[in-house]
Amino acid sequence: MGLGPIPATEKALRRAGLTIADIQLAEINEAFAVQALAVMQALGLSSDITNVNGGAIALGHPLGCSGARILTTLIHEMRRRAPTAPRPFYGLAALCVGVGQGEATIVEWLN
């Protein structure tokens, strides 16, 4: 349980024609600490760009709307960094869902 973001992210990256190296900011669901660390390790995500404002343990884990919280946090941080971010500027929002499922969305900042 909790590793669903790994294949979901890999699939989203393939569909977008990107690699994990193209991602400059990531918000990963932190259902529990070791789960987020396992996902980061498997995907090769740096702690410098992942959950930069804290994960669900710090910010809260709103059951039923975790995806909305993760995407909103990602977009707010992308907007904050946009003036100095290299282009193209890509962010990743990913979360685990019950019984091993996962979701991933790649956001491209256009400005």
What are these language model-derived features?
Residues 1-111:
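Claisen-condensing/thiolase-fold acyl-transfer catalytic domains that form or cleave C-C bonds
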